[in-house]
Amino acid sequence: MKLLTNLKKNRSYVVILLLTVLYALLLSANPVGDAYSNAFASQSGEDMFSPHHLLYAFYGNIILKLFGFLPFEPMTLLQLANAVVAGGCLLLIRRMLKRIHHEESFLCASVLFCGASFGFMRFATDNECYIVPLFFCLLSIYYLQVFLVRNSMSWLLK
């Protein structure tokens, strides 16, 4: 009974969990050329710091070294990592929106709207490099928001 009450109070977390599971179950079946290039660079260790997708091959190489023992192809493993990072993006979006509006139905609808958009789902389910920088961008905005809420910025005006 208490679990159902907590789930009702925090429906947006359930939406985030369901979307993350959906991303992980519905990985892209026809990846683009960049996805193959990223997987090859991550697996081989060559061209790790390509200016085209700076640091993504390095990130992929770390993922493959940490979870390479799992019975997945490198492309699938990197797609799963992107799905998990996409779930992290949705958590950050929820945290930022909660400061603006506390109503759970608003949070639930907003997270669903962001998480179910085509662009977000495409990069969450494919081996593309855009979801990881989005996560770090949202993380930096979240911490900027925390700073601005806790500290007064009046000293900037002097």
Give residue ranges: language-model regions:
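Start-transfer (signal-anchor) and selected internal transmembrane alpha helices
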Residues: 1-22
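Extracytoplasmic catalytic/substrate-binding loops of multi-pass membrane glycan-assembly enzymes
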Residues: 25-40, 47-63
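Loop-to-helix entry region of an early transmembrane alpha helix in multi-pass inner-membrane enzymes
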Residues: 54, 69-91, 123
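Membrane-helix interface segments
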Residues: 74, 102-108, 150-157
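Transmembrane-helix motifs of polytopic, lipid-linked glycan transferases
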Residues: 80-101, 139, 143
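Specific aromatic-rich, kink-prone transmembrane helix
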Residues: 92, 116, 120, 132-150, ...
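Transmembrane-helix signature of polytopic, membrane-embedded enzymes
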Residues: 93-116
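Short acidic/glycine- and proline-prone juxtamembrane loop motifs at membrane-interface regions
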Residues: 122-130
